[in-house]
């Protein structure tokens, strides 16, 4: 039984046991493009990946399943070497603690996503990045593009082109790196981890 066959079973909920860790060769492989029209198996896998992210961000389900909270998941992280990523970025509460009008600033499963253009300006998260496939803290600025234009297909086989900036751009770049065999710490300057080149945007 392939990893995907196990993951898409109706009763299966993706948990931390399904997520492979650094050292596994799947994380360093360039994943294969999915074919269109999408197979039911690839659609279900995308839905399961999104379900995992929602569970991971839910305090009750997260604790029940022992999940680390995540905002993105790429198919290679669950040992399926395909170009599929899921992104779920929640909007914050307002200054008075009221819930946001829109729960998520980005909620999408992207098939065969690719960056078609990007800004000259770089950006990095002030607190660095983490990864569900990396069980250790790696400090430093993960240098990325401040703005990107991404093309992808959705589960209905429809093509989209979106412009992203800020945190959403960072998350999508992190996940696209996964389908290209790149891990976040590859983008940290090993000699000077917190080097900020002139003009680089540091996102708090």
From Swiss-Prot:
Identify which residues the record assigns to the active site.
175
Family, as annotated: Belongs to the polypeptide deformylase family.
Q: Single GO molecular-function term?
A: peptide deformylase activity
Name of the protein in its database record? Peptide deformylase
Question: What EC designation does it have?
Answer: 3.5.1.88
Q: Which reaction does it catalyse?
A: N-terminal N-formyl-L-methionyl-[peptide] + H2O = N-terminal L-methionyl-[peptide] + formate
What is the UniProt remark on how the cofactor binds and its stoichiometry?
Binds 1 Fe(2+) ion.
State the Pfam families in the record: Pep_deformylase
A biological process (GO) of this protein is: co-translational protein modification
Gene3D superfamilies attached to this UniProt entry: Peptide deformylase
Q: What does this protein do?
A: Removes the formyl group from the N-terminal Met of newly synthesized proteins. Requires at least a dipeptide for an efficient rate of reaction. N-terminal L-methionine is a prerequisite for activity but the enzyme has broad specificity at other positions.
Record-listed Fe cation binding positions: 131, 174, 178
Gene designation per UniProt: def
Cofactor dependence is on: Fe(2+)
Q: Which UniProt keywords apply?
A: Hydrolase, Iron, Metal-binding, Protein biosynthesis
The disulfide bonds in this chain are none
**NCBIfam families linked:** pept_deformyl
Keyword Iron attributed: yes
Supply the SUPFAM superfamilies for this chain: Peptide deformylase (SSF56420)
